[in-house]
Amino acid sequence: MPRKIITEELKQEIVNYYLSKPMTLKQVEDKYELSHPTISKILKDVSKYTKAKLNNPDMKEHFFQEINSEENAYFLGLLIADGNVFKDNTGRQASISITLDLKDEYMLQKFKEVLRADTSIGYDGRGCGQIAVRSNIMAEDLAKYGVIPRKSYHTYLPEIPNQYMWHVLRGIFDGDGSILAKPSPNNDGHNRFLHCVSFCGTHKLMEDISNYLYTNLAFKQKPTVYDYKDRQLSELKIQNIDDIYLFGIYIYKGATIFLNRKYKIFLDFKQHYNLD
């Protein structure tokens, strides 16, 4: 078989073909019937597709490269609270996952949709669902914001444009926060209305949130430390009626992504106190 002549036109055709869609070098070799060294040389200056891109060509691997939208700000917050980054046994492939209660499964579906991820939601048999995507690029971007393997010991509030910080806080709140607004009977048979917003997490993260709320809303609450298993965590509580109202107004202002059950409790709180 005569040796194929590699013209400049053929080289450009091969480059264009490779860039037309995610594919392996082997696929290019087979199409043009050229050796691996030849194809590698022709494509040496072209960025290669990652394993994640090959397996899931439509996925937005660069979703967290820059925090510049409600969607990536909110899911960054949710990952800070309820996310996990881990490597496979080889240490070369990173995965990013979020685990939520089954009643919040729709948020896992939303995450899947915004990433265009071709993956399924898994279930642990204990009332939780999980979505996991493989991407070294995404893991590297998230590391810039403190979402790293074993992050539970090191989380903090990252520096991002202030216009997106409330979306991040809402994501953290939906993951590791709680809101209470309900009547509770007293010993005399009458009801009192309980209300509270709280965050739990590392002392650094709670201090960061406390400082942010002080700077932006003049809140004076400080986190308290408590022992949890083999480590210490902190809790930040907001119990003043006006502060809870102001907090809710800010985290839900213009929001389209949030856990419905927590937002409903905030609406119940507003209704009980006739707050507008």
Spans of features found by a protein language model:
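Internal intein/HINT superfamily modules and their associated LAGLIDADG
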Residues: 1-276
